[in-house]
Amino acid sequence: MEVCLPNGHQVVDLINNAFEGRVSIYSAQEGWDKTISAQPDMMVCGGAVVCMHCLGVVGSLQRKLKHLPHHRCNQQIRHQDYVDVQFADRVTAHWKRGMLSFVAQMHEMMNDVSPDDLDRVRTEGGSLVELNWLQVDPNSMFRSIHSSWTDPLQVVDDLDTKLDQYWTALNLMIDSSDLIPNFMMRDPSHAFNGVKLGGDARQTQFSRTFDSRSSLEWGVMVYDYSELEHDPSKGRAYRKELVTPARDFGHFGLSHYSRATTPILGKMPAVFSGMLTGNCKMYPFIKGTAKLKTVRKLVEAVNHAWGVEKIRYALGPGGMTGWYNRTMQQAPIVLTPAALTMFPDTIKFGDLNYPVMIGDPMILG
């Protein structure tokens, strides 16, 4: 596990979405660009050049910086400088048991797939296996908003080992079969490349850069499809009103968009990236640097786009403002049951009965 809370990439995404465009970012590996393939060190925002590690202003647009200047952040973050974000034990325990139930059942179903069924899905598209949310760990607190954190937990021996084994095996099955799951994040460098979407979009090679104005969003697997709509300005057909975790629940994935080990169960947001290990890493934010005035605009834009409830559920009390203030103060973040009361019920977060599937997205959904 890498990063659970928003990191440099995700801050770039947030600002891209808030300002409906792509901002220039700087990485030591790639220099200035509008792509987000490398860890960003600086970005241009609101007429200022901002350090992505402390959100302090380090220069202006007129002075195009060629490297991250020395400032009070002095950002050459070392691994030993990372801050551990610890999750409450019972939160982790409930989550891991839910995950184990999910991956074990999906693995068993994939094992039962016949070669004929696999060939049919490869040729015609569609769903290969489906797992209904209601089949996942009926005793988990994540099943119902009325469940209690103190409810009895099933004892599972070698829980971490089993989780790792099942998840790894499931990934291998999916990759070896060239299938697309709708429940986990994939490396955006190959997520849609060459995938048959049907219609005019068949075999379209999509850009590897993030574009908030596009109907296709990187870093997550699309898990719902609607009608194709043709945009002459784009020169291709695309899916209108795509439902993606990035747009619906915020992008709280892993750093560098690496594959998450957190599936999206039904329409439940995968915001607990660190739950499978009980902790995650985040960059330390150094006090004393000039704060980014744009943060307030950004918070307002994100709250408007996603809704306060979703933000609070994802980041805990205080939402994004609270997260920003806590990290700027370098305070250890402990997620407790009280911080996770915003369970995504059917009213706020859609139908939890939504199935999770593996198959070809040509007619998936």
Swiss-Prot record:
Keywords on record: Capsid protein, Host cytoplasm, Host nucleus, Host-virus interaction, Inhibition of host innate immune response by virus, Inhibition of host interferon signaling pathway by virus, Inhibition of host PKR by virus, Interferon antiviral system evasion, Metal-binding, Outer capsid protein, RNA-binding, Transcription, Transcription regulation, Translation regulation, Viral immunoevasion, Virion, Zinc, Zinc-finger
Chain positions of all zinc fingers (CCHC-type): 51-73
Keyword match Repressor: no
Major localization listed first in the record, in broad terms: virion
GO cellular component, one term: host cell nucleus
Maturation and modification: Cleaved during virus the endosomal proteolytic disassembly of the outer capsid.
Top-level taxon: Viruses
A Pfam family that the UniProt record links to this protein: Reovirus_cap
SUPFAM superfamilies in the cross-refs: Outer capsid protein sigma 3
GO BP terms in the entry: regulation of translation; symbiont-mediated suppression of host innate immune response; symbiont-mediated suppression of host PKR/eIFalpha signaling; symbiont-mediated suppression of host type I interferon-mediated signaling pathway; viral life cycle
Subcellular localization(s) per the UniProt record: Virion; Host cytoplasm; Host nucleus
GO MF annotation terms: protein serine/threonine kinase inhibitor activity; RNA binding; structural molecule activity; zinc ion binding
InterPro entries listed in its UniProt record: Reo_capsid_sigma3, Reovirus_capsid_sigma-3_dom_sf
Quaternary structure (record): Heterohexamer of three sigma-3 and three Mu-1 proteins. The RNA-binding form is probably a homodimer.
Protein name: Outer capsid protein sigma-3
Protein source organism: Reovirus type 3 (strain Dearing) (T3D)
Gene that this sequence comes from: S4
